């Protein structure tokens, strides 16, 4: 009113941080369950780079244990990626959608498969697969070959297969989706799921087959990243 100029204010806030994020190091040292993490921070000299290195080592170990419990792995290798699986354990699901909205109340890994027909004029051409967004992480395969992996629930997935692997006829896309908690699945709009080559698009939305791999229930606690707001003491300096 004083300047006679309209002013717009946007309140962009995000919640969900745990209490320990807002608590000091000295206080958490006295709280049962946090002593080990506080000792690690002290040993690292509170240096973010060293804590990140430790996190990556812990995450690698956790993933090895997690993957070892996944029904989709055998002797450490994925076993559902080379051919279309047809067992009774595989169920249909219409995608894209959070799988909770399709009746699957589950946190963990879910394997999705879809058989596609590669047109003759795509043979020998690079093919792009657009898979909307996947919550949280994924590893994607085509005819038994890994074509990409991404972390992050709100990141659009686009993977390419080289011209040398593009052959006319039937092919199988396999997606191992990993959801650590909350909503999970291949989500977005139907028009965001398609394959593309030679100036042509073919929709990938619709029915896929799925099989659960390993549940987060009973799994060891996933390591926390020191770069996230869930890390103990991370928000305390801003108080």
Language model feature labels by segment:
Residues 102-104:
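Outer-membrane beta-barrel proteins
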Residues 2-3:
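A short, Lys/Arg-enriched amphipathic alpha-helix followed by its capping loop at the start of a domain
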């Amino acid at each position: 009113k004083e300047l006679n100029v309209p002013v717009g204010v946007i309140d962009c806030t995000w919640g969900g941080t745990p209490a320990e994020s807002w608590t000091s190091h000295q206080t958490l040292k006295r709280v049962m369950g946090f002593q080990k993490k506080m000792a690690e921070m002290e040993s690292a000299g509170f240096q973010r780079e060293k804590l990140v290195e430790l996190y990556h080592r812990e995450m690698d170990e956790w993933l090895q244990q997690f993957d070892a419990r996944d029904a989709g792995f055998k002797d450490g290798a994925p076993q559902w990626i080379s051919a279309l699986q047809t067992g009774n354990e595989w169920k249909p699901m219409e995608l894209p959608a959070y799988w909770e909205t399709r009746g699957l109340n589950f946190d963990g890994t879910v394997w999705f498969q879809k058989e596609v027909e590669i047109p003759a004029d795509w043979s020998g051409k690079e093919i792009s697969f657009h898979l909307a967004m996947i919550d949280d992480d994924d590893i994607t395969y085509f005819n038994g070959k890994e074509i990409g992996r991404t972390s992050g629930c709100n990141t659009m997935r686009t993977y390419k297969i080289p011209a040398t692997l593009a052959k006319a006829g039937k092919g199988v896309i396999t997606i191992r989706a990993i959801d650590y908690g909350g909503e999970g699945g291949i989500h977005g709009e139907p028009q965001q799921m398609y394959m593309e080559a030679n100036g042509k698009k073919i929709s990938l939305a619709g029915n896929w087959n799925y099989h659960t791999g390993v549940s987060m229930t009973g799994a060891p606690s996933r390591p926390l990243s020191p770069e996230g707001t869930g890390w103990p003491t991370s928000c305390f300096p801003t108080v």
